[in-house]
Amino acid sequence: MNRKTHIPVENETKSSATRTTNDGRAITYEMQVLQQPQRARACGQGAKSSADRRPVDPPPIVELKIFEGEKRDDITYTMHANYFLFATLEQARPIAHARGQDRNTHPVLTGTPVAGMVYLDRPTPAGYFIFPDLSVRHEGEYRLSFSLYEELKNPKDEDKPEEACDAAGGDAHVTHRLEVKSAPFHVYSAKKFPGLTESTHLSRMVAEQGCRVRIRRDVRMRRREPKSGGKDWDEYEEDTAAARARASATPDPSINGYMQTPHGFIEPNPRPRSASNASHQSLGSISRRPSMQEMGQAYHQQPHYGTAPHTPQNGYTQTAPYGPPPGQQYPPNQFVQQQPPMQPPLPQYQPPNYPAPPPPVTAAQQPQPAQSYYNYPAAPPPPQATQVQQYNVSAHAYDSGVQSHRPSIDFPAQDGYRRNSQQIPPTSQPTAYTQPMQPQYAAQMPPAQHYQQPPPPPPSQASQHSSYSSMDLYNSRPAPIEPHHHGNTPASKASFDLPPINTAAMVSNKLEASSPTSVAPTNAYFSGGQTPIDTHKRSYGDVFSNRHHNAPLRQGQRPSYGQGDSLVTGTTMSAADDDDNASSELDPSTLGMHYRRADGRQIQRALPGHA
């Protein structure tokens, strides 16, 4: 700060003035700035400036003494008048004003710029003016100017008439006596402010005598490391002028080996770009389908039957024993449903032909083992050994079944392809693979798509269970189970019927009548294996009205029932049709109350006492 030029003033720190009263007495006023301001933090402008202000530190303290005559008698305590000091802010350095800016605009000074005089005994008996609440809005170099104003109470202490007009400048109640200026001090920004210092001895002394001064007993200075060069912005700007001029120049197009940057000339990095694509492996889709080349490599390693591999529907996905495909380096998410891979062309992967099975045995002697391949019990052979049963391999029949019950193939141990499989307890025959193909579909397929039934395994392996294998992803589904032949079926005709489903337990547990869809005709699988219909049971049309099933309903019509078309009537049911009535007498429960529900159904309630 020594190199900076400040505006010189005559009344810095000390100032004095003398006047003559009406009775000819000479009164001298002397002011001295006992405590100079040293630093302040700029509080800025806006709503938050008043809430976060830092006062000028330390608080300025100005001392006033009044003397009378040439003997300089101290009349500070005996002078009958009121005194107050008004503080203003001035620039300590010359500032060039911008164009259009008013030269009379002063820096903004906030806080309490006015202080009244207090009489204190220490450090010396005198009048003191204390400014504990002064703040500056902008950073820079400033000085404070203090102006003393006097309000006289005794008429004899007033100035002479000719001097009073010049001093007051009109009819005024107060008179300006003198002015004193403080030493220059620096106002820092919030970032560079070093902090408030500990309260001075003078501030403590004034506070002990009852004046309102904030006392700080701890050091609150901020430790800031000096810059490496110790240079201010002005010197730094001069040193870096050449470098900034170089950076703003246009680069020379003839220079190829170097490039120009704001920080100078640097040599480009000669290292070539890496050719590794390891960082792109994680960008692939998790559920990407393998390409035809990948499918071909997988299909050449094991025998196939021209069908699409199966994707398990459970939450735990199975991967191939030799790792994921080349385009997928990370295992797929366990909770993302995988898309099934593309099905390879059927003519390219033809199923192998198996030899004819051994001579068959009768249905009564041969039990029906579970369906399997290789080391699992196979289905019973057909009645005639000379006839070869051919089954159609269809992706439609494969996809239409329930895949959760599908047992996979457990192949013999092979090098590099054997994995532990998850055992599944034996269950009933899965419906997805016991449903045979219709004859019309088999006639449309080429002969190369048929294969013979595998030979039956030894009886010792009949108790083994089917299991899930990881090879199931690239192998076809198991062959359909051998159909069961009835005794009245001709030997020369191939039957695709299976044993009938036992529905006795299902019917006994039902609490309501079957819907019309349950009694509708089904496919050949169910039609051939059903038991003969009991003639003593009533049909659906005898008990319930099926008129609204066939007749169309137009324009908001609802099912309407005539007198003879009621859902439950006592006249349509005869006593002979009811299995529960052994006698020919009419059941009283049929003569109960009849009413119709909102959905059109007719409800019957039995008579009291006959329920």
Swiss-Prot record:
The keyword Transcription regulation applies. InterPro entries: Velvet (IPR021740), Velvet_dom (IPR037525), Velvet_dom_sf (IPR038491). Residues 455-499 are annotated as: PEST. Residues 1-57, 222-497, 511-611 are annotated as: Disordered. A motif (Nuclear localization signal) lies at residues 38-43. Residues 341-361 have a biased composition (Pro residues). Residues 242-254, 330-340, 362-377, 435-452, 461-471 have a biased composition (Low complexity). Residues 14-23, 274-290, 419-434, 511-533 have a biased composition (Polar residues). Belongs to the velvet family. VeA subfamily. PANTHER family: DEVELOPMENTAL AND SECONDARY METABOLISM REGULATOR VEA (PTHR33572:SF14), SPORE DEVELOPMENT REGULATOR VOSA (PTHR33572). Component of the velvet transcription factor complex that controls sexual/asexual developmental ratio in response to light, promoting sexual development in the darkness while stimulating asexual sporulation under illumination. The velvet complex hat acts as a global regulator for secondary metabolite gene expression. Controls the expression of the dothistromin gene cluster. Regulates hyphal growth and pigment formation. Acts as a positive regulator of virulence. This is Developmental and secondary metabolism regulator veA. It comes from Dothistroma septosporum (strain NZE10 / CBS 128990).
